[in-house]
Regions:
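Non-catalytic cap/lid and distal C-terminal segments of serine-dependent acyl enzymes
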Residues: 42-316
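N-terminal targeting or regulatory segments adjacent to alpha/beta-hydrolase or S9 domains
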Residues: 8-23, 30-58
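Intrinsically disordered, low-complexity regulatory regions of eukaryotic regulatory proteins
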Residues: 1, 22-23, 268
Length: 316
């Protein structure tokens, strides 16, 4: 039977269940555990919280893709997850200046995820501690602003490979560490810069993801100041190379027979929308250009809503 993935917690997906053996005891406890525990020599548990009868665990690990730096992620597992039953997963990508904690603490996802018995994985937004000159000089470049690309410009290319970190390294780590998540049944969503990353990964790697949703995403980064700055900083070919990480460009070049499931929500009171940094309408225009069924590209604009996490909560 074909599984239709629940994306942004509203597109339903038939599911199987599963859970990390190390979490079984924590699932029965409401307390936060802050002592570190090493799991199979690769993952270290930094903390655990019970939430909606499931467990939110913060892990740290050494990332080969990010140049050997320590990386962190949060993983929510619903109550039904256990060693014998794996659950499908949503990857949530956060925006500029965020960490792995922002959406986990403010996104309001867990009640719906628990109801649907879905795992959610929250990666970080960039490497941390690379100590590259200029890395901390700007809020929209460097630390907290990895832009979900694989950098090709030195010295960034040693560390700033968030595309492979999310797409390859984290799913491989989940599988190797026997966290009870079925990585073959995955969808992806995100906010702002993370919405950009989610759209790009879905459009480039549809074999990995069933659907994509994005809140206030940067949809056409080669045509906005934020995207141009990041592409010129990370990519040897600058904006021209950035086209491979531009959702509108990717959509415009898809085969007309390609089946997509794209949902975008954006507030009309979002200052970034007003400044033409987001350009969600470009996705529909790109779909028309490629001949794709644009009914499967939903762009919903909401009067009065802004760029904040409260707007994300409204769309759930």
């Amino acid at each position: 039977m074909h599984d239709q993935m629940l994306m942004t917690l509203h597109i339903r997906f038939s599911r199987s269940h599963g859970a990390h053996p190390a979490l079984d005891g924590a699932a029965a406890s409401c307390c936060l555990r802050t002592s570190t525990t090493t799991v199979n020599m690769s993952l270290t548990i930094q903390s655990q919280n019970k939430v909606f009868e499931g467990v939110l665990t913060k892990y740290s690990f050494r990332s080969k893709v990010l140049g050997g730096l320590e990386a962190k992620m949060n993983v929510f597992l619903p109550e039904s997850a256990n060693a014998g039953h794996k659950v499908p997963v949503l990857y949530f990508l956060s925006g500029l200046t965020c960490t792995e904690d922002n959406a986990a603490q403010k996104g309001h996802f867990f009640e719906a995820a628990a109801k649907e018995q879905l795992a959610i994985v929250f990666p970080d937004t960039s490497p941390r501690g690379a100590n590259i000159p200029g890395e901390e000089d700007s809020w929209d470049f460097g630390t907290g602003a990895g832009f979900y690309v694989n950098a090709t410009k030195e010295p960034w290319n040693k560390y700033y490979n968030m595309y492979d970190h999310v797409l390859k390294e984290i799913p491989q780590l989940i599988a190797s560490e026997q966290i009870p998540i079925d990585v073959s049944r995955a969808s992806i969503f995100g906010h702002s810069m993370g919405g950009h990353g989610a759209l790009v990964m879905y459009l480039r790697e549809q074999a990995h993801f069933r659907s994509v949703s994005a809140f206030a995403p940067i949809c056409h980064p080669t045509n906005c100041e934020t995207g141009k700055k990041l592409f010129e900083g990370y990519l040897a070919g600058g904006i021209d190379d950035g086209k491979q990480y531009d959702a509108a460009v990717l959509l415009s070049k898809l085969e007309s027979s390609r089946q997509v499931d794209v949902l975008v929500d954006c507030g009309l009171n979002d200052n970034f929308y007003k400044q033409k940094q987001l350009q969600p309408e470009s996705l529909v225009e790109a779909g028309k250009k490629s001949g794709i069924d644009t009914a499967r590209i939903q762009v919903r604009l909401h009067d009065g809503y802004d760029h904040s996490c409260t707007s994300i909560a409204n769309e759930l």
